[in-house]
């Protein structure tokens, strides 16, 4: 791992790209809190995120993408109509949707019932990261399981002192994304 690396886009895009596709994990700002990211197709990244957080795989993990085109093969059963409706439901607030998992995901990203979670993010840095790698990115809050999510670089460093980071500004959301099961329309987190 590149100890305590602090990257900025676009100037460090090659280092970030190599890190992601080498199975690396890193912290980065999201719409409301700092997240832990990695490649959802790489079991090393998934297992490292679970280890860092002290969390089991039972809950699955969230992915973020910059647009629906990046989700092809990562989610399934989401029609163009569903995509448009999800964007309408989300409005301006970050909203994560639970949908059926696609074939590209590695173990532990999907739940036992074959579902996964995806958020199409309007955050400029997330859009830039996903455009760089051409696919979704794992995204879970940068904290130990059960603890408060990190809202500053200092808080990320307190939880994960040696974790590489992509620097940037947090979005304007005051709390983590709401989560909705798209098929049942059940609100999991408001």
UniProtKB/Swiss-Prot annotation:
Listed PROSITE patterns: YRDC
Subcellular location, record wording: Cytoplasm
Enzyme class (EC, first level): transferase
Disulphide bridges, residue numbers: none
Domain YrdC-like: 10-190
GO molecular function terms attached to this record: ATP binding; double-stranded RNA binding; L-threonylcarbamoyladenylate synthase; tRNA binding
Pfam (any one): Sua5_yciO_yrdC
Listed EC numbers: 2.7.7.87
One GO cellular component, as annotated: cytoplasm
Primary location: cytoplasm
Keyword Amino-acid biosynthesis attached: no
Catalytic reaction(s) noted: L-threonine + hydrogencarbonate + ATP = L-threonylcarbamoyladenylate + diphosphate + H2O
Keyword tRNA processing belongs to the record: yes
Top-level taxon of the source organism: Bacteria
Keywords: ATP-binding, Cytoplasm, Nucleotide-binding, Nucleotidyltransferase, Transferase, tRNA processing
Gene Ontology terms describing biological process: regulation of translational fidelity; tRNA threonylcarbamoyladenosine modification
PANTHER family: SUA5 (PTHR17490), THREONYLCARBAMOYL-AMP SYNTHASE (PTHR17490:SF18)
Family classification: Belongs to the SUA5 family. TsaC subfamily.
Free-text function comment from the UniProt entry: Required for the formation of a threonylcarbamoyl group on adenosine at position 37 (t(6)A37) in tRNAs that read codons beginning with adenine. Catalyzes the conversion of L-threonine, HCO(3)(-)/CO(2) and ATP to give threonylcarbamoyl-AMP (TC-AMP) as the acyladenylate intermediate, with the release of diphosphate.
Name by which UniProt lists this protein: Threonylcarbamoyl-AMP synthase
Organism of this sequence: Dichelobacter nodosus (strain VCS1703A)
